[in-house]
């Protein structure tokens, strides 16, 4: 999918990510990936930079929206169409691959992964306190 749409804030981060080959991006450092998903309404590819962690071969992302009362739009897009393209930092620069998004439904597993992500981005713990919703955790599983 070739991305055709991003917010101005996201575009700045995307441009920086490409210029730095995924390293030292903004305040997030080396933990930013670019996920391209189809818009649920438009069907157009939309690229979103996201903080990520790893769990084995899987990439963990968190639908925090800064602790807002609603989920980010990209989560709705994934629920509509879970097949995505991912660009991520790798040992040899960056890598691109296709993945499937899996919502973590098991509460204990979600809590384990969320705790792992707060070690990478401590603000997630604050975001969780700001909202009444359970912040969703998503695994991006590489398609083979």
For the regions a protein language model found, what residue spans apply to each?
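Short helix-to-loop capping/linker segments positioned immediately adjacent to catalytic or ligand/cofactor-binding
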Residues: 22-24, 41, 124-128
């Amino acid at each position: 999918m070739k991305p055709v749409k991003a917010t101005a804030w996201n575009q700045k981060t995307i441009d920086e990510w490409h210029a730095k080959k995924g390293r030292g991006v903004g305040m997030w450092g080396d933990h930013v990936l670019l996920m391209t998903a189809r818009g649920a309404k438009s069907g157009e590819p939309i690229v979103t930079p996201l903080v990520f962690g790893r769990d084995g071969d899987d990439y963990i992302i968190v639908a925090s929206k800064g602790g807002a009362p609603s989920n980010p739009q990209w989560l709705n897009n994934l629920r509509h169409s879970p097949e995505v393209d991912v660009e991520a930092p790798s040992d040899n620069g960056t890598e691109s691959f296709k993945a499937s998004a899996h919502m973590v439904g098991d509460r204990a597993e979600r809590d384990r992964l969320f705790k792992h992500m707060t070690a990478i981005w401590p603000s997630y713990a604050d975001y969780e306190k700001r909202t009444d919703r359970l912040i969703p955790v998503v695994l991006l599983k590489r398609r083979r």
